[in-house]
Amino acid sequence: MDLQTKLESIIPTYRERVKILVKERGDVKVDEVTIAQVYGGMRGIKSLVTDISFVDPDEGIRFRGHTIPETLAMLPKPPDSEVPYVGGLYYLFLVGEVPLESDALEVEQEWQARSHVPDYVFNVLRSMPVGSHPMMLFSQAILALQHESLFARRYQEGMTKDEYWIPMLDDSLNLTAKLPTIAAFIYSLKYKDGTYKEPNPELDWGANFAYMMGVDT
């Protein structure tokens, strides 16, 4: 998988950057926190390190430094579509580079291969009380999928910290591949007839979600 190869080439650089930052600047204060901020939902507090996103107070969220309009404009799109491949956005998040169409399509193909949702997940959702909130059902389905986690399996078998990212990448791809099917089924369970609609292998991630939701694509 080219995505894994790409990450394998850049992860050591990120690790070295963090190592140097902690060693040389570990005692630098990054913020001061007031009681009002604590009671105000932690708003404005610098408490996380991330390269993926940042919320600009004037322009809104930025993904890898790009505004939403910039992101939508620069990502590869399916033919005759104004909306990019979701696989391209995923690639941008992980790698930090604008993907080629081939990069986006590789992610889309990985998702198609990993999209099967085990029957027990649907059974868990069907067994939940009527009136359960859709987000609770969504969370419950994701928790049920822990049984499928490659990271959990590898962790029990034993692996070094330098290897963590490999099964984490697999788990990330496996989970994101299944989310459209799970979300569409929850929508059907809550607001329609509760039937399950199989994904269409000819459609990309975003189009498949719309298809399973009953939206005309």
Across the structure, where does each feature detected by a protein language model lie?
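Hydrophobic alpha-helical bundle cores within soluble ligand-binding/oligomerization subdomains
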Residues: M1-T217
